[in-house]
């Protein structure tokens, strides 16, 4: 068994310093990861003559992209905390079995999803609202991206196991390397080689492939604390079952983004037309600047909470949670204020169309009005995961999007003359309600969860 050189740090190190060491690289990685899609959209939106239609087409692929991410995190977000808890209990053998089983699951999922989505994507794109013009661009992008699904799942699903060991910088470099390659290749493939939308997809797949190689080399190398071994890749239900049970809440959160995207697009298309749908495409990208860094903060806090929970150190678990909690709230509150004051600056990144910039700026102020409360909800819900509370985490994951937001998108327009305003208003209403319920639930159960572990 390898010596856990990071154990003393997790058990005795300064909590704020640990969170900074683990969260900052994770946040940077999440922001850079966001560039994969944002850079594609910015470049595609500026393709001469076809930019608007091409951007719309690529946007229609978003629900499928979200589902691929959801399946990757089903394994990664559930397996990594389980591995961290095992490490906290000094059971590295179990932690390595979890790593091996999760890798096998990701490979299997990649094969199945590639086949299913490659065959069904044209039909799905039509259901999402693709026209004869936009379907061409959507299909061109989708087919190439889907063929690279294996690399996407490996990068998203296995990188969490690097972070959970305390190697946050290595984890960050996975994303940095891929994003830099993508940013360099995008203009070459799109403009220089004249590949257009196909070039954007190919650049993304190649950059993800390099990231996957980086991860696998590290996890099979000498520096890792948990090594990926063939002997641990044989699936055992008792090993991967608890991982999937824990990861299901993240899967639900991410997969419902797909349904949410379809709900917003269909309603806005009905009440506001193309300009409203275009504004939503911009808003979706900007909103990820809130949610992805939050995930990074919680990814940094998760190993600290999980490890000390497994090591039966409740005081350090509490301190880690409250440090993470306050950080999330400060970030979302600050972002909310910036968007309220400078919405046009954000909208103008994605388009030079004055009408769309004005419309998107108006919509942003409505949509983001409750974004400050997301810090409460995400921090508490993710902390339930870090503590191994899969059922509660799943319920709270369902609350905001499935129980509240999606129904409100269709209900609120019945009570307002401005139907588009009502559709956008559904977001802050659901944000605030979900955050209130989640925060109360967490603080009600937190102490009892810690006592049960004694």
Predicted segment positions?
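Short alpha-helical transmembrane segments in multi-pass integral membrane proteins
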Residues: 1-25, 83-150, 192-247, 305-370, ...
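N-terminal transmembrane alpha-helices
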Residues: 10-50, 63-78, 82, 107-114, ...
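Residue-level signal for transmembrane alpha-helical positions in Major Facilitator Superfamily
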Residues: 20, 35-36, 75, 116-120, ...
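Transmembrane helical elements of multi-pass membrane transporters/channels
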Residues: 21-40, 144, 178, 207-211, ...
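Helix-terminus/linker motif at the lipid-water interface of multi-pass membrane proteins
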Residues: 31, 35-56, 125-132, 188-195, ...
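Small-residue-rich hydrophobic transmembrane alpha-helices
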Residues: 55-115, 152-171, 279-343, 374-393
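Short runs within selected transmembrane alpha-helices of multi-pass transporters and secretion channels
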Residues: 145-163, 171-179, 200-213, 295-299, ...
């Amino acid at each position: 068994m390898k010596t856990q050189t990071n154990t003393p740090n997790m058990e005795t190190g300064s909590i704020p310093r640990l969170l900074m060491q683990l969260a900052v690289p994770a946040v940077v990685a999440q922001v850079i990861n966001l560039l994969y899609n944002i850079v594609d959209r910015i470049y595609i939106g500026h393709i001469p003559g076809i930019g608007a239609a091409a951007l719309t087409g690529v946007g229609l692929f978003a629900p499928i992209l979200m589902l691929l991410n959801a399946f990757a995190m089903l394994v990664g977000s559930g397996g990594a905390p389980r591995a961290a808890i095992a490490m906290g209990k000094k059971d590295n053998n179990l932690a390595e079995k979890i790593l091996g089983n999760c890798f096998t699951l990701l490979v299997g999922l990649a094969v199945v999803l590639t086949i299913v989505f490659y065959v069904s994507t044209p039909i799905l794109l039509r259901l999402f609202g693709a026209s004869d013009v936009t379907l061409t661009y959507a299909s061109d992008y989708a087919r190439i991206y889907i063929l690279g699904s294996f690399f996407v799942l490996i990068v998203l699903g296995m990188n969490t196991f690097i972070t959970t060991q305390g190697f946050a910088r290595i984890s960050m470099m996975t994303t940095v390397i891929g994003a830099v390659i993508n940013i360099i290749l995008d203009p070459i493939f799109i403009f220089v080689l004249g590949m257009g939308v196909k070039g954007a997809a190919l650049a993304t797949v190649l950059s993800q492939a390099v990231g996957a190689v980086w991860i696998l080399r590290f996890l099979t190398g000498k520096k890792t604390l948990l090594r990926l071994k063939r002997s641990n890749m044989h699936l055992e239900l008792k090993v991967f079952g608890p991982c999937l049970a824990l990861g299901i809440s993240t899967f639900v959160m991410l997969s419902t983004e797909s349904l949410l995207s379809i709900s917003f697009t269909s309603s806005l298309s009905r009440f506001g037309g193309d300009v409203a749908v275009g504004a939503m495409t911009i808003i979706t990208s900007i909103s990820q600047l809130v949610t992805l860094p939050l995930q990074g903060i919680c990814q940094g806090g998760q190993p600290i909470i999980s490890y000390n929970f497994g090591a039966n150190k409740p005081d350090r678990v509490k301190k880690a949670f409250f440090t993470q909690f306050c950080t999330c709230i400060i970030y979302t509150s600050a972002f909310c204020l910036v968007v309220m004051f400078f919405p046009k600056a954000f909208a103008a990144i994605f388009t030079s169309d004055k009408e769309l910039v004005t419309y998107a700026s108006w919509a942003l102020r409505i949509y983001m009005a409750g974004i400050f409360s997301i810090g409460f909800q995400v921090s508490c819900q993710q902390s339930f995961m870090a503590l191994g509370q899969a059922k509660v985490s799943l319920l709270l994951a369902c609350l905001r999007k499935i129980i509240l937001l999606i129904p409100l998108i269709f209900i609120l327009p019945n009570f307002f003359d401005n139907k588009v305003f009502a559709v956008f208003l559904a977001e802050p209403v659901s944000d605030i309600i979900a955050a209130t319920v989640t925060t109360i639930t967490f603080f009600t159960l937190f102490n009892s969860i810690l006592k049960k572990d004694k």
